C-alpha cells in the first residue's frame, strides 16, 4: 500500500537491487524501459527509477504516458532493451502500487531472477548513487505506435469492420485508454468508449473488469446497440468481456472460446497451456484436437516461458490473463478483447452461442472460485491437511491428487477442487468445477466444509 510498504525509501531499495542485477548481467552497458499505469505519483516514481539507473550507468528509456503492461513488454523486446520496470498494481485498489520487472524477452521475471534481485537489495533506502556520474542520458520512447501496429498484424480488423458489429470499450480509467478504441476507430469500426479519462482513483474502486463494475459498459452497449463489450483492468494485462445481452463471460470460458477459435481459423496445433486452477474444458479441447496440454502453477511467468519456446497456440489463466502464439510472453487484455470481437464477427454468433457449441463438442464445464478467511488456528490445521492424501471429502471420492500448485483433488466423475493458500493474507482460494451449475454449487459447499471441519 502506498505510504506504508510502498515508500520512496523502498522504491529506492528495489530499483537499486534491479540496477545492480542489470549491471551484473550487462557490465558493458545496458538500457532499461521504465513505464507505469495511471496511479497517483506514477510520474515521480518513474523519474526516481531513472535517476537511480543512471547512477549505475544504465540508460533509462522512459515512457512518459501511462501504458498497458503488454505494450511495455512489446516495446522492450522491440528496442532490444535489457529489462523493463513497470510501476503498477494491476487490478488492485487505487491505494496500492507495485514494481514489476520484466526480462529482455518481455516476460515476467522467473523466481530465480527475482531471488537474485532480492539478494542485491540494500538495507537502507535513504540514498542512491549519484545521478549521471558517468554522463548517462535518459531517452523518451512511445510504445503505442509499434504495439498497435503489431495488433493490426494479429487481428483481422477488416473482417470486423465488414461484419458491421458495434463495440463498447471500457478501459476502467486505466493504461489502455486510447489504445483499443483508437485501433478500432482508425479501422472504421464503430466503437463507444466509457471511463476514458484519467482518474488516479479509478472511480473509487479496484480497476477490475468484473460483475457490477461493468454496469456502465452494459448501459453503453444497450444505447449503442453493440454486439460486444470489451474491458481492461488498471494496467490492461487482464480483460473483461460482456456479451450482447449484458452477460459477463467469465475468463475461463473466454480462454476456451479463443483456444477453439484460433485452432479453427489459424490452424495452429502446437500446444495449449493453463494454470492448475483453470477450467478443464481446456483439457477436453486439447484432447479433442489432439493438442499437447501444459498445466502450470498459478503465475503467468510459467506460461510466458512456453510462449517464448513457441510451444503454444494460446496460454491463459482463470484470473483473466492470456496471450497467444507469436506475441509477447505476457498477459494482454487488449489482445484478448480484440480477439473476442473477431470471433463474434467471423462466426456471426454471440459468445454464449459459441460456448454452447463448445459444450456440445466436449461436454459442459461449470467453474467457480471462492475465497475464505482463516483464523490462525484453522489455518494451522488446514495447512497440515494440504500435505495429506484424502480418499474422499464430504462424500466425493478422490481419484487423484495434483500438487502442481497447492492441492488439486480430482474426483471420480471428473469434477475437481483446488486449494491454494494466499502468500500475503490469511485466505485460502478454492477453485471448483463440475458438469452442471447445481453440481458445482454442491461441490463448492463440500470443499468449504473440508476446510473448517
Q: Model segments located where?
A:
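Proline/glycine-rich low-complexity loops and linkers
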Residues: 64, 119-149, 244-316, 323-324
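N-terminal small/polar loop signature for handling phosphorylated ligands or for N-terminal nucleophile
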Residues: 20, 28-97, 182-242
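Gly/Ser/Thr-rich active-site loops/lids in small-molecule metabolic enzymes
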Residues: 110, 193-195, 247-266, 333-341
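An N-terminal, well-structured beta->alpha segment
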Residues: 1-51, 55-56, 136-167
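Phosphate-binding and adjacent anionic-ligand microenvironments
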Residues: 227-228, 268-453
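Gly/Ser/Thr-enriched, mixed-charge loops and adjacent short helices
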Residues: 97-224
